[in-house]
């Protein structure tokens, strides 16, 4: 039986917006999952965010963040279709349908004012 691996997840990320600070709270803080399982990561905003301005990133140690999803649900170039984004308003979700070993990383949601 495989030993569960840790999928790290940042709790809080805030970025200023023209309408004031929007606080993004991610949950859960960590997920203990194994390859082949499904991961669901949530991002809640303190005020409504246009779906056109919500992105998800993956970051591995020593590397720059990699854009996965933009406009809440659009996959960036080269991102496998096991990654999907959904949501609107104040509640957004990143789903990884079947975890691969290379998916174990830190994930961030970001509200932005124009294309990421």
Swiss-Prot record:
<dbReference type="Pfam" id="PF07686">
    <property type="entry name" value="V-set"/>
</dbReference>
<feature type="region of interest" description="Complementarity-determining-2">
    <location>
        <begin position="71"/>
        <end position="77"/>
    </location>
</feature>
<dbReference type="InterPro" id="IPR036179">
    <property type="entry name" value="Ig-like_dom_sf"/>
</dbReference>
<dbReference type="GO" id="GO:0019814">
    <property type="term" value="C:immunoglobulin complex"/>
</dbReference>
<comment type="function">
    <text>V region of the variable domain of immunoglobulin light chains that participates in the antigen recognition. Immunoglobulins, also known as antibodies, are membrane-bound or secreted glycoproteins produced by B lymphocytes. In the recognition phase of humoral immunity, the membrane-bound immunoglobulins serve as receptors which, upon binding of a specific antigen, trigger the clonal expansion and differentiation of B lymphocytes into immunoglobulins-secreting plasma cells.</text>
</comment>
<keyword id="KW-0472">Membrane</keyword>
<keyword id="KW-0393">Immunoglobulin domain</keyword>
<protein>
    <recommendedName>
        <fullName>Immunoglobulin kappa variable 3D-20</fullName>
    </recommendedName>
</protein>
<dbReference type="GO" id="GO:0006955">
    <property type="term" value="P:immune response"/>
</dbReference>
<keyword id="KW-1064">Adaptive immunity</keyword>
<dbReference type="InterPro" id="IPR050150">
    <property type="entry name" value="IgV_Light_Chain"/>
</dbReference>
<dbReference type="GO" id="GO:0005886">
    <property type="term" value="C:plasma membrane"/>
</dbReference>
<dbReference type="GO" id="GO:0005576">
    <property type="term" value="C:extracellular region"/>
</dbReference>
<keyword id="KW-0391">Immunity</keyword>
<keyword id="KW-1280">Immunoglobulin</keyword>
<comment type="subunit">
    <text>Immunoglobulins are composed of two identical heavy chains and two identical light chains; disulfide-linked.</text>
</comment>
<feature type="region of interest" description="Framework-3">
    <location>
        <begin position="78"/>
        <end position="109"/>
    </location>
</feature>
<dbReference type="InterPro" id="IPR013783">
    <property type="entry name" value="Ig-like_fold"/>
</dbReference>
<keyword id="KW-1003">Cell membrane</keyword>
<dbReference type="InterPro" id="IPR003599">
    <property type="entry name" value="Ig_sub"/>
</dbReference>
<dbReference type="GO" id="GO:0002250">
    <property type="term" value="P:adaptive immune response"/>
</dbReference>
<feature type="signal peptide">
    <location>
        <begin position="1"/>
        <end position="20"/>
    </location>
</feature>
<keyword id="KW-0964">Secreted</keyword>
<keyword id="KW-0732">Signal</keyword>
<dbReference type="InterPro" id="IPR013106">
    <property type="entry name" value="Ig_V-set"/>
</dbReference>
<feature type="region of interest" description="Framework-1">
    <location>
        <begin position="21"/>
        <end position="43"/>
    </location>
</feature>
<keyword id="KW-1015">Disulfide bond</keyword>
<dbReference type="InterPro" id="IPR007110">
    <property type="entry name" value="Ig-like_dom"/>
</dbReference>
<feature type="region of interest" description="Framework-2">
    <location>
        <begin position="56"/>
        <end position="70"/>
    </location>
</feature>
<feature type="domain" description="Ig-like">
    <location>
        <begin position="21"/>
        <end position="116"/>
    </location>
</feature>
<feature type="disulfide bond">
    <location>
        <begin position="43"/>
        <end position="109"/>
    </location>
</feature>
<feature type="region of interest" description="Complementarity-determining-1">
    <location>
        <begin position="44"/>
        <end position="55"/>
    </location>
</feature>
<feature type="region of interest" description="Complementarity-determining-3">
    <location>
        <begin position="110"/>
        <end position="116"/>
    </location>
</feature>
